[in-house]
């Protein structure tokens, strides 16, 4: 296995053309790429061809957006059908309260490894203590939490950003979460840009904060992020692409040009991800 891609959205028409309808066009412009629709089997074949494991992400922002979710069961089914190629994270809508907390047990029973949350799209502030029961149950169940942080390709370049607020996704909002739940692995996606220095300081302070580098072509990742990934935080970074918006092969190719020592690259591409997923 060459890598674990920790940030893979389903490229199926059900998600892209229904749940994400109207968002995709802005995202394509932001990423300067055309999003290609693929079936689950085609996606598995694509990742098998490059010898990369994909962590598939469910999605639930029904309360804030009114859009249909990507069910946890869909991700779990893909993982069962392609166990050597896929692992999965479920999703819950924090605004659903007790229902969301109860759904966490279902996520575990489905064999999923963590939970994906998108504060900007779900319109919630992660440091609001109303959501403490959700984090507490994740900690009890051993579920990692992957938060979208920083700016968003969804809504980018549109009037009002299509109503999406970036302040929800400030990395500092995860600091209180990581402090209150020290056994909870908190993964900050997209390294929190433009607040990446804030996130780097948090990760240096709290070893249960991890950072994924998805959503950016590696050659554009800020130098401060690369420096800490090579150095003090090499055990807390994980590889990710943000597929289908960015192709994993491009990310792997560009990482080679960043002068990252092979032992460090092994950690970022594989070892740290394995530890978070609990796989040998």
Give names to the regions the model predicted.
Residues 11-14, 61-64, 94-98, 151-155, ...:
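Active-site environment of divalent metal-dependent phosphoester hydrolases
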Residues 7, 75, 88, 107, ...:
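Conserved, mostly hydrophobic/aromatic
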Residues 1-49, 53, 105, 233-238, ...:
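Mid-to-C-terminal alpha-helical segments outside catalytic/metal-binding sites
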Residues 2-11, 107, 134, 146-148, ...:
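A generic "structured core" feature
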Residues 113-114, 127-238:
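Catalytic pocket-lining loop regions of alpha/beta-barrel enzymes
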Residues 8, 58-59, 90-94, 117-119, ...:
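A cross-domain feature marking catalytic cores of carbohydrate-active enzymes
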Residues 53, 61-156, 165:
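Active-site gating/metal-coordination segments in enzymes
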Residues 37-48, 69-76, 80, 98-109, ...:
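Amphipathic, non-transmembrane alpha-helical secondary structure
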